[in-house]
Amino acid sequence: MSGSKGFRTPDASDKPERGEVNLSLRTVQRMLPLVQRIVDDILACQKAVVQLQPQEASLDRQKRELAWPERARRYQIKEEMAQADISLQDALSELRDLGVVLLDSEQGRVGFPTLVNNRRAYFSWHPGEDGLHSWQFADEDVTRPIPLAWLKEISYSGKA
């Protein structure tokens, strides 16, 4: 890999074929800080909606009897929920634009598409992990640790 600027293998190219994105481990490691922030935004939006839904439901049931302050609060909650939904859709769109897949919306687990032995796979990460440690085949739920050999190839090819 002398002279190579990035980690490349035949199984993991940054160039999409047939519209599919295949990310190298090196690229995924560089993308991770941005994706972490996007996932944090997604989880915050979901939490906001979950917290506002009971208030909205309660005020909606009483909407004909509400005094102005409660009615104003009902409108405010609806606006906050709409804004949270817009922010959520924006964050999901950012992930899609990066080629990243949301594998578990409750946990915030994401998959970075790649190929392993010519099979569709994901490098996976979720909030709470201090870095990228696992991967899985796209058609399986079983996560596997990233082999040390893959990590060594990155360190041999330059700064990780």
Region locations from a protein language model:
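Mixed-charge, polar/low-complexity N-terminal
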Residues: 3-4, 10-13, 18, 23-24, ...
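Charge-rich, acidic-biased intrinsically disordered regions
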Residues: 54-80, 101-122
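Arginine residue identity/basic-tract feature
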Residues: 8, 18, 26, 30, ...
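Amphipathic coiled-coil alpha-helices
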Residues: 38-41, 45-48, 52-55, 59, ...
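Long, hydrophobic N-terminal alpha-helical segment
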Residues: 1-62
